[in-house]
C-alpha cells in the first residue's frame, strides 16, 4: 500500500517517519520543501504539489494546523482532491471544525473517494513513539482499509461511528477538557505561590491525588517554566478553544470555562506568547 503524508510539522514529521518504519511506500509534501529532506534521505519520495502526492498514494494523511491549511492542500487545481484516485482515502489527522469535516466528507464522496476523520490525542513525543491515541469516524470500508496503517501510528483507536464530524467534535471536546485543566492548574499554582509553596511541591501533592499524566506533564512544564520548544503552541490553543465555542454554539451548549480560557489566551498572544507552549497560560493569568 502506498501512503502520502501532507504536512511535516511537529506532528507530521514523526507520523511520516513511522509510516516509513512500518514498511509502507511513502510520498511526502510540505509547503517548506526543506522539511522533506530528512525523510527523502530515509527512503521517502517528495512531491511538488498535494495533487502529485495524492496521485501516487492509496491513502493520503493530512496533518496540518487548521481548516484553512487543510482546505489549501485539498481543493484547487493542485489539491489532493484532484490527485486521489476513485476509492482512495483521505485521512485528516488535524483538529478541524465540525462544519469543515462535513464539507470534506461531501467533497470526497462526490469524487467516489473516502474521507476518514482521525484526529489524534498526544504530543510530538507520543507521535515519535507511535503512541498516539486516535479517534476515527467515517465509512466502515475506509476504516477497515486504514486500520493497519493507523495501528502502526498509535497505541489505541477509538471508533465513534460513520459520520466524520463526530470524531472532530470529540477531539474538540477533549482539547476543551485540556484547556480547562490548564486553566485550573494555573490558577491553583499561582494561589499556592502566594502562600509560599513551591509549584513543584504543590504538583507532587496534586499528582498523588489525581494521578493524571496531563497534570504531571503540563504541571512540570509550568513549574520549570519550560515553554520552549512548544509541544503545542498557545496560538493553536486559542484556535482549538474557538473551535470548541463554535461547536457548542451549533448545538446550543454553554462553555463558560472556554470563554474564560479564550480571554486568557488572547491576552497571552497580545503579550507575545503565541509561539510558547500552551501551558504558558499560567503567564497570562498573573
UniProtKB/Swiss-Prot annotation:
It comes from the Bacteria. GO terms for biological process: organic acid catabolic process. The gene is yfjR. Gene3D superfamilies: N-(1-d-carboxylethyl)-l-norvaline Dehydrogenase, domain 2 (1.10.1040.10), NAD(P)-binding Rossmann-like Domain (3.40.50.720). Pfam families: NAD_binding_11, NAD_binding_2. It comes from Bacillus subtilis (strain 168). NAD(+) binds at residues 4-18, 95, 239. InterPro entries: 6-PGluconate_DH-like_C_sf (IPR008927), 6PGD_dom2 (IPR013328), 6PGDH_NADP-bd (IPR006115), HIBADH-like_NADP-bd (IPR029154), HIBADH-related (IPR015815), HIBADH-related_NP60_sf (IPR051265), NAD(P)-bd_dom_sf (IPR036291). Its EC number is 1.1.-.-. GO terms for molecular function: NAD binding; NADP binding; oxidoreductase activity. Belongs to the HIBADH-related family. The active site is at residue 171. This is Uncharacterized oxidoreductase YfjR. Keywords: NAD, Oxidoreductase.
